[in-house]
Amino acid sequence: MAWQAPQSVKPSQSSATSDPAPIADSKVNRPIADYRYPEGQTFTYGVDWRLLTAGTTVVHFDTVNGERHVVVTADSTGAVALLYHVHDKLETFFNPQSNCALQLIKHTEEGFRRVETSVRYDYHALKAVLDERNIRAKNQKHEENDIPPCVTNTVSAALYVGSQPLQQGTKFRFPSSDGGKAADIEVTVEGREKVKTPSGSYNTIRVSAEALNGPQKGKGKVWIWYSDDQKRMAVQMRLRAFWGTIVFHLAQIRSGA
């Protein structure tokens, strides 16, 4: 499931703090020994916004040439699709031993926006190399932004968190970049909870996450309920922003291509 920060704006925030110093204890750690990546599986999520069924998100997991490969598609449906068209596809590769993101590819269709984005993580140069093409505006941009020796991104971050110890009451921080300067994300392991979704009932570990710096600071908060087992499946996710709350419920799990 994509860990996409809500897009809200707070008037009190100033661009003068857009380049904060990185937080010293923010780092990406290796997965715990008994974590099980959902190889070859496809998760389908129903998406609700306020009282409406808003769309569907599908996530497929596999491994390509020794690299973890995750593909996410998100589509608005029903009345919400009439109000606001969404057809997004996000694809990432990351290292299974280190959890470091290697590449991110995004196709964005949101409202009238049509954007193609490619991000390559160059850990030798400590740069995120971004190339973006705005199809409607017919312009392109190329950026190279500083990153630490290992980062996650909007897709791999949710998997990264699930691969960690998740001891109740603890907090940890990690850097994430979708091609821009890395932001530090703080995760709080809030507790255990029984959750029922269309795919079944689960004993879960609930965590919350929010950006400590960067462009998404103060613009929303994310909660994820992970299955309390070796799989650490994201069975439910809630994103809260000024325009409301979006909830993802795990509806179906399929194995195979």
Short names for language-model regions:
Residues 3-123, 160-257:
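Acidic, serine/threonine-rich low-complexity disordered tracts
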Residues 115-161:
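Hydrophobic, well-structured mid-protein blocks that either form specific transmembrane helices
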